[in-house]
């Protein structure tokens, strides 16, 4: 195994305290959304701070056009795979559409994420309108974050994927949502598709750390989907996504080479086949011949 692929020998899972304290220390926390065992393993090897089991997996892993079809059963199954792939990485489970629309439902599903999925914390979406849900989760002892700005669960109300907070009034609503999340006891919040200056100013008003996706460099940390930044998911690329690799191109080239070698008889060769002792093979041929004449 190369040095680049070797697991960090002394890596310890991040704690809630460390994540909260990153606000004061100035350490930029790195989050990435990982839908499966392999991408989670890559994230841990790379030193990512938080592996996010995002309901975006409904799109990048299941081919849906939005996150709405994600179910708790689906999310728990993927969370289990992520935990196996990244056992030493703090894991945050994103609660899917309508899985937290009542306090009882939120507590039940958040508990599933923690007990069955192996997550270290959960993240619903929403601010003031969900503050009672967030507080109930926190009060029950479940580490909880939230997500504001562009919230995929309410995308239809926004008229599609549109930047949020571009007017002073809209920006104030995001600020009030942020304070509601903090007051509910959440340890972190995520901004999505918010103008950089707005997200930066709001972040400075808060005591809890913020992470951004399409919210500029002024947030306390950043999150991108691993399938986006690695070029695995290529159906579309949001403006805020930077491609650090193009694994789809590499994968297609590899598969084309495989197809070509099988079609032309070059694969498998002796190096990729199992041998047999000559005497055993000769005996086998004799047995086959005898069977033909029975």
UniProtKB/Swiss-Prot annotation:
Residues holding Mg(2+): 55
Signal peptide (UniProt feature, chain positions): none
GO molecular function: 3-methyl-2-oxobutanoate hydroxymethyltransferase activity; magnesium ion binding
Entry keyword Cytoplasm: yes
Cofactor details (free text): Binds 1 Mg(2+) ion per subunit.
Residues noted as binding 3-methyl-2-oxobutanoate in the record, renumbered to the chain: 55-56, 123
Family recorded in the similarity comment: Belongs to the PanB family.
Role played: Catalyzes the reversible reaction in which hydroxymethyl group from 5,10-methylenetetrahydrofolate is transferred onto alpha-ketoisovalerate to form ketopantoate.
Assembly and binders: Homodecamer; pentamer of dimers.
Name of the protein in question: 3-methyl-2-oxobutanoate hydroxymethyltransferase 1
Gene: panB1
